[in-house]
């Protein structure tokens, strides 16, 4: 690869910008959720359409929504289940987080739940004008005072697609100019986070929705998995390289070197130092380790 001059002017966020992002996040994190106690169990939650809804009623509605025939599981891992469903007349995405084992449960005695962190970050992004699905509510559940699970509810956004379908190796039929434009806009979307004093710790392409992918005037990336967002910070070089590796590594094990280099080049348009020999070595080594782990899991 050849080193080129930066095409864009990136300036780290000012301290006031970081303070604002941090303040918005902390305010949202302290959302006054209704809480009830019954039979050794505690429920806490909120639903924006009906602020006075009891958490027990919201839990009942969520359980009904995810078991209806028209619901569909989008993603399921050992501890996370993402379901598309209908709730209170809305089409929604319900993301449930289960805690695994006593150590993790004890840890969340001292940390906000993933759902509450998602809620706070999503509220912050929307107030800053950064695209993300509308946060609608969240639930937290404790058993005998110990955290057990939580769930986050966001609006379903019609007409969007998983960004990995357009940027990954499965997008092999996409014209090169489309891939280049998508990569350029993705780099810009991540830089927008940085400029707003926000760092996302997991920027793989499956953590973004893509809106109007073929229309350059309306094309938009929407951020998901916002429990991984850190608000009120200035991302440093290590964090930027990590994001580049996450994007490049998420293209899939069959992506070509040219496709990965395209991602690096679009980021380097904002951060020319990414083309330095040492930075490139870090990126390639880190990406290779990531891909090796994926192959072992297959």
Residue ranges and their predicted role:
Residues 91-93, 153, 220-223, 246:
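Short hydrophobic-acidic sequence motifs that mark active-site Asp/Glu residues
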Residues 59-163, 191, 195-196:
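Conserved ATP-binding subdomain of kinase catalytic cores across diverse folds
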Residues 222-287:
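C-lobe/activation-segment region of protein kinase-like
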